[in-house]
Amino acid sequence: MSNQRSSLKHLNTFALPAYASNVISAGSVETLIAAWHESKAKRQPVLLLGEGSNVLFIKNFSGTVLLNRIMGITSTEDSAAWYLHVGAGENWHQLVCHSLQNNMPGLENLALIPGCVGSAPIQNIGAYGVELKQVCEYVDLLDMDKGTIQRISAEECQFGYRDSIFKHRYGNGFAIVSVGIKLMKSWTPTLGYGDLIHMDPLTVTATDIFNSVCTMRRSKLPDPMVTGNAGSFFKNPVVSAAIAEEIVHCYPNAPHYLQPDGSVKLAAGWLIDQCSLKGYQIGGAAVHQQQALVLINQSEATGQDVIHLARYIRQQVAQRFSIWLEPEVRFIADNGEVNAVEHLS
């Protein structure tokens, strides 16, 4: 569209070419509210964006992109825990580093997850056996229409696997402005995944885990500053014990993780790899050579290139395993977020 003047290429880690009518950086609640009402008066859609690390622009955006840049970290403590109040615009990995530098362990398994703190509850980010829901105490949510802030308890957030109430009830018109983190002083290491299983729980430190997680992530995940990507493109599928048993019977080395409710989580990257898709390319988009779960901007890819590649991957995995992968990445069209699964079906 001719009125779309603001490039979003530097605002999404896929580095895809996309444009918006306007981009506003908001460092305060007041700026968020003012920009929201101005866009509403113009009858333009608004997209709230953090660091753009989990979005796929499949079309140009027809309205205003509002960058949440509310900063600040404060901490208090009692005999049982440390309590951090963190602005939504803070970088997640820098928060992890800050907590460890101040001898507050508990976030180390979540090191190097891209994005900002405000995006973390939306996805209920997780890695190496730890999810945000285990450390989140509350989320402060701004209703931009009313100009009011309400505190949502962790229980009210309805956290699920890469899911929360913020993807459903509190979508358009709401902005996360801060997140409360609670880190227990009775720290115990979580060592169930990857190279962490080789560590001694009696002697390991939070810094040891942090360093190991950083090494693992850097070895298999491309740096978005070098190669455009949005991290894990698909969710790891959670299936019934019966389906998992069938797959493990045919593929004894298939990674699988029993869940508390008796279901089993499978590794989406492994499923894709079994279809021999590493390096597979459509247009400018490709499957990463080291980690099949990551789709990359190989050479001037468009959003449609990524869509076509993701659709092909889903079909190949479904053909082989009768499992339909669901995207973890959020799909953004001209008026805002759209249903990713429907778009790939």
From Swiss-Prot:
Principal cellular location given in the protein's record: cytoplasm
InterPro entries, per database record: FAD-bd_PCMH, FAD-bd_PCMH-like_sf, FAD-bd_PCMH_sub1, FAD-bd_PCMH_sub2, MurB, MurB_C, MurB_C_sf, Oxid_FAD_bind_N
Segments passing through the bilayer: none
Domain spans labelled FAD-binding PCMH-type: 16-186
Subcellular location: Cytoplasm
Catalytic residue positions: 162, 232, 328
SUPFAM superfamilies attached to this UniProt entry: FAD-binding/transporter-associated domain-like, Uridine diphospho-N-Acetylenolpyruvylglucosamine reductase, MurB, C-terminal domain
Keywords recorded for this protein, A-Z: Cell cycle, Cell division, Cell shape, Cell wall biogenesis/degradation, Cytoplasm, FAD, Flavoprotein, NADP, Oxidoreductase, Peptidoglycan synthesis
GO molecular function terms noted in the UniProt entry: FAD binding; flavin adenine dinucleotide binding; UDP-N-acetylmuramate dehydrogenase activity
Pathway where it operates: Cell wall biogenesis; peptidoglycan biosynthesis
A single BP term in Gene Ontology: cell wall organization
Pfam family name, one: MurB_C
Catalytic reaction list: UDP-N-acetyl-alpha-D-muramate + NADP(+) = UDP-N-acetyl-3-O-(1-carboxyvinyl)-alpha-D-glucosamine + NADPH + H(+)
Annotated Gene Ontology cellular component terms: cytosol
Cited PANTHER family: UDP-N-ACETYLENOLPYRUVOYLGLUCOSAMINE REDUCTASE
Function summary: Cell wall formation.
Family: Belongs to the MurB family.
Descriptive protein name: UDP-N-acetylenolpyruvoylglucosamine reductase
Taxonomic source organism: Yersinia pestis
